[in-house]
Each structure stands twice: as C-alpha cells, then as structure tokens.
C-alpha cells in the first residue's frame, strides 16, 4: 500500500513489477514483500512504499508521486550497481561473509536472523551510495537524507543449496543454488553474497542477476508508467531511440538529456512498440 497525504485525485503514475501472482500477494502471488522508506527526499518529508505487482500513485499535482515512483524504479532497475566490485571490510558485509563461510557446501535454511544480515548490508550500500544513485535516476542532484528497506517478510522459507554437478548459480522462490566449492576465496564469496542479497529482495520482482540484454532490455525489468499528461504523450514520437541512447550514454560524464532515467526507459519501450507496429504493416 502506498499512502500519500493527498485527498484529491488529479494525476496517476505507476510501475508494473513482473510477478506470477494476483494483486493480493497471497498463496499464488508474491512470496515476499518489503517497504521502501525515504526521509527528506526532494519535497517529501517521509514516505513508505510497500511493493506489489502493480503500484499506482494517485494524488494532487506536484505532491511527489513521480519522485517516489522513480526512486523505487531506480532501486529495482539499478540496484545491482551498488554492490561492491571488490570484497569489503565494512562490518555489515563481513557478517554476511562469515555466515556464508560457515555454511559452504551445506544445505542451510536462511533464518530471519540470516536474512536480516543481508538486508542490513543492502541498506548500508543504499545509505553510502544514495546520492549517486539518485543523481543517476533523475539526471540532476536531489536531496535525500534516508533511503532504506524495511519490514521484509516472506510467505515461504528459502534455503541455500549446493550441487556438485551444477556449473552456474540459480534461484527459485524456495532456494538459492550454488555449485559446490572446495575453498572459496573472498572474491567468490562476494559474488555469492551479492547473488543471495539481490535474490532475497528481488527474485520474481526485478530482472535476475544474470540476464542478457535483448533489444535493449533485460527480461523482468520493471516498467515505469508516467502520468498521462497530453503534452508529454504527444512529444514522445519525436524522440528517437538513438538520440535517447546517446543522451544517456555511460561514456558521457554529464548526461545531456533533461528527462529522468525512468522516462527515458519508458520512451525507449514505446518507441520499440511503434517500430514493431510499423513493421507489421509492411
């Protein structure tokens, strides 16, 4: 549920998460839920967003709906980028590393306490990188004091399993599987810990950890649906795929586009639909 201090219905913004579920998150639906908490973010003093397969923000114009939806979209889409490239000496990560070392090659249930280690690590990464993440999402600096995941819950338990015949990592709603290892070094432990952390939060919600890019998108990426302001919808056709990609090229130190990244992603998506539609008429 998303609660904003808005009484008047004016504009609506939403995001679709990939889920094989109903909208209630029951037995056939989401196997996990968590809340994104922000404080002193742009014009928003405090807000909590609990994930669901379809999230709609409804309220007054300029009440902060797009800010909240954009930050949620950004964590789901760009969250993998905040994990360190080298083993960290931070206390939160070292606790995850120690836990995993104790359970190498042993089928182990992820208890509430174990899961909390990984949520704490992810929150520390969010805290230290929140300004850079927000700038990447919005294409300009936005004030943010707190950004973290709270109220993590699961409908079903999950465990770590090891397979001597496996050659790759894999995940389902019930287990995270790794190939058996003789003696994992710190780099291998980091890769496994990042995989565990990401999937505890994002399995079935965002794109999997290892997902190829097909036609510019990763399977499972959330879709941001901006408010349907007429002027915006009339201009999208003028924005072509190449110009958007150039504007947000990772090689450019300062992005030249004035659009936020969720809007660019949405425009690229509907541009592809437009191209496919034209091709089908030929």
Where are these regions (language model features)?
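P-loop NTPase switch/coupling surface
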Residues: 1-259
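ABC-family P-loop ATPase nucleotide-binding domains
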Residues: 268, 273-282
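Aromatic- and Gly/Pro-rich amphipathic surface segment
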Residues: 253-271
């Amino acid at each position: 549920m998303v609660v904003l201090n808005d009484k008047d219905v004016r504009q609506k913004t939403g995001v679709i998460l990939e889920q094989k579920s109903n909208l209630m998150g029951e037995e056939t639906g989401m196997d996990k839920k968590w809340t994104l908490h922000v404080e002193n973010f742009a014009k928003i003093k405090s807000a909590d967003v609990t994930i669901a397969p379809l999230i709609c923000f409804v309220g007054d114009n300029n009440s902060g709906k797009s800010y909240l939806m954009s930050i949620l979209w950004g964590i789901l889409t760009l969250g993998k980028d905040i994990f360190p490239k080298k083993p960290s000496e931070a206390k939160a990560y070292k606790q995850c590393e120690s836990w995993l070392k104790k359970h190498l090659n042993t089928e182990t249930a992820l208890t509430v306490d174990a899961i909390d280690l990984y949520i704490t690590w992810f929150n520390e990464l969010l805290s230290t990188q929140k300004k850079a993440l927000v700038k990447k999402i919005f294409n300009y600096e936005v004030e943010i004091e707190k950004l973290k995941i709270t109220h993590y819950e699961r409908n079903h338990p999950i465990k770590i399993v090891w397979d001597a015949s496996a050659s790759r990592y894999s995940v389902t709603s019930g287990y995270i599987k790794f190939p058996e290892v003789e003696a994992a070094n710190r780099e291998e432990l980091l890769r496994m810990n990042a995989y565990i952390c990401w999937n505890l939060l994002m399995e079935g919600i965002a794109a999997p950890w290892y997902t190829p890019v097909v036609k510019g998108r990763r399977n499972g990426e959330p879709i941001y649906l901006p408010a349907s302001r007429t002027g915006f919808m009339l201009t999208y056709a003028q924005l072509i795929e190449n110009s958007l990609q150039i504007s947000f090229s990772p090689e450019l130190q300062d992005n030249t586009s004035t659009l936020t990244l969720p809007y660019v992603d949405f425009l690229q998506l509907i541009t592809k639909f437009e191209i496919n539609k034209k091709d089908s008429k030929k």
